[in-house]
Structures are given as C-alpha cells and as structure tokens.
Amino acid sequence: MPLLDSFTVDHKIMNAPAVRVAKTMKTPGGDTITVFDLRFNKPNVDMMGEKGIHTLEHLFAGFIRAHLNADDVEIIDVSPMGCRTGFYMSLIGTPDEKRVADAWMKAMQDVLNVEKMEDIPELNEYQCGTYTMHSLEEAKSIAQNIIDHGIGVNKNENIALDKETLKALGNDV
C-alpha cells in the first residue's frame, strides 16, 4: 500500500490548534489544489467528541467558505479526520496559512453565534446520515477552545519523519 502524505509527519510533535499545508497538486487544467490540515487537537492527547465534531462539520463547512472563498480561492471540501483531531480542507488556490487561520478563527466565532439546534444546516433525516448525533454545546466548546488558544502553523519540514524512522515503522520508502 502506498505511504500517504498524512502519515509522513510526526504526530507526536505536531502542534494544535494549527494549520498546515498538507499537499499541493496541479490539475490537468493547470489549477492548483491545496489540501490543508486544520488541526484542532494535539494527536494522541485529545480529540473532539463525536456529536461535537459532527455538528461542527455541518457549521464549519459553510462558515469557513464565507470567510475564505474569493476570486482566487474556492473551497472544494471540508471534512473531519477519522482520528477526530481535526479537519482536512481541499481548495482550488494557494492561500497562505495566515489567511486560512484568519478565516478559521472567524468561522469559530460564527459557531459561537449559533443560538439553537434548529439553526444547524441540513440537520434532518433527509440530508444527514446520523441526524440525531449532534451537540451544539459541544461544537461551541470546540470553537471556544480554538479562540482561546489561537491558531499556529505546522510546517512539514519541521515535523517530517525521516526515512530511517519511516522504514523502522514498516513503511516502504
């Protein structure tokens, strides 16, 4: 199995909350797609609760688009990580980490401004696969944690696993 980019960085030294350019690629049409690692929690230390991350998924995807989409950026997808320590965001364009962090922070403030469960988009059995698994209170707690701690930057070159370590962990490199 090929070694995926997300597993070539040392999760033990990764900071959170922090933004990281996980990958960039060119499409056949010449557009640049950038994938960001939006790390909410320190890996293997803390993770978001399932109800909170699910509610945040519904809110964050729209809110960050409102603050980041522009003539030079269009978000393709914002999805929670299986480990529940963050989200991956794929977009067309190349915004820098500060611009992404600023939009993320504004989106977290938007989450705090949501008043009731009925204000959560697509919260129904037709548009959500587990519509009863939500908590606005948990989502707000996650957002407040980001606001309280601020958002840093993880650079790949500072957290990359070296080839010897990857080999020792059983990876073909």
From Swiss-Prot:
Tell me the organism: Hydrogenovibrio crunogenus (strain DSM 25203 / XCL-2)
Q: Which gene encodes it?
A: luxS
Q: What is this protein called?
A: S-ribosylhomocysteine lyase
- Function field: Involved in the synthesis of autoinducer 2 (AI-2) which is secreted by bacteria and is used to communicate both the cell density and the metabolic potential of the environment. The regulation of gene expression in response to changes in cell density is called quorum sensing. Catalyzes the transformation of S-ribosylhomocysteine (RHC) to homocysteine (HC) and 4,5-dihydroxy-2,3-pentadione (DPD).
In the record, what lineage is assigned to the organism producing the protein? Bacteria, Pseudomonadati, Pseudomonadota, Gammaproteobacteria, Thiotrichales
GO biological process, alphabetically ordered: quorum sensing
Specify one Pfam family: LuxS
> Partners and quaternary state?
Homodimer.
Q: What is its EC number?
A: 4.4.1.21
HAMAP family, A to Z: LuxS (MF_00091)
Family membership: Belongs to the LuxS family.
Source domain of life is: Bacteria
